[in-house]
Amino acid sequence: MSRRNTAVKRSISSDPVYNSQLIHMMISHILKEGKKALAYRLMYDAMKRIEKTTQQDPILVVERAVRNATPTIEVKARRMGGSIYQVPLEVKPERGTALALRWILLAARNRTGRDMVAKLSNELMDASNRIGNAVRKRDEMHRMAEANKAFAHIRV
């Protein structure tokens, strides 16, 4: 562990259109090779598509999707006595949100088709309805933590 000063947490700015920190975090996760304008366009087009399809506020759909994909428990590998145990740990809210955003984007990128706007909007709508690969990944992580509950006493 480093003995130097700990890094100061930076505050997350809000995006200019929806004034939401969550949308800004999503745009930052979409970002590839520094093309921020493209990331903004992808996210805003996906939001318009969600609004057109569901007739609901797109921010509420995105927030519900992230909430449904956010894990509460994760497992961490810990080596003890020559064997490796999967130790269940609680997830901090910031990490949970970051994992949910990462999984939603990964699931959207792995969908078939070429149109990223359609893939992202469909994954967000699926996650808000508690289906889709991002929610499945969260459930899988919870199942692994439940299966390894016996090792919860081990310190990480």
Curated annotation (Swiss-Prot):
InterPro entries: Ribosomal_uS7, Ribosomal_uS7_bac/org-type, Ribosomal_uS7_CS, Ribosomal_uS7_dom, Ribosomal_uS7_dom_sf
One example GO MF annotation: structural constituent of ribosome
Gene Ontology cellular component list: chloroplast; small ribosomal subunit
BP-aspect Gene Ontology terms: translation
Entry keyword annotation includes rRNA-binding: yes
PROSITE patterns: RIBOSOMAL_S7
Coiled coil: none
Primary localization: plastid
Keywords: Chloroplast, Plastid, Ribonucleoprotein, Ribosomal protein, RNA-binding, rRNA-binding
Pfam families the record matches: Ribosomal_S7
Described function: One of the primary rRNA binding proteins, it binds directly to 16S rRNA where it nucleates assembly of the head domain of the 30S subunit.
Record text on subunit structure and interactions: Part of the 30S ribosomal subunit.
Similarity remark: Belongs to the universal ribosomal protein uS7 family.
Protein name in UniProt: Small ribosomal subunit protein uS7c
Gene: rps7
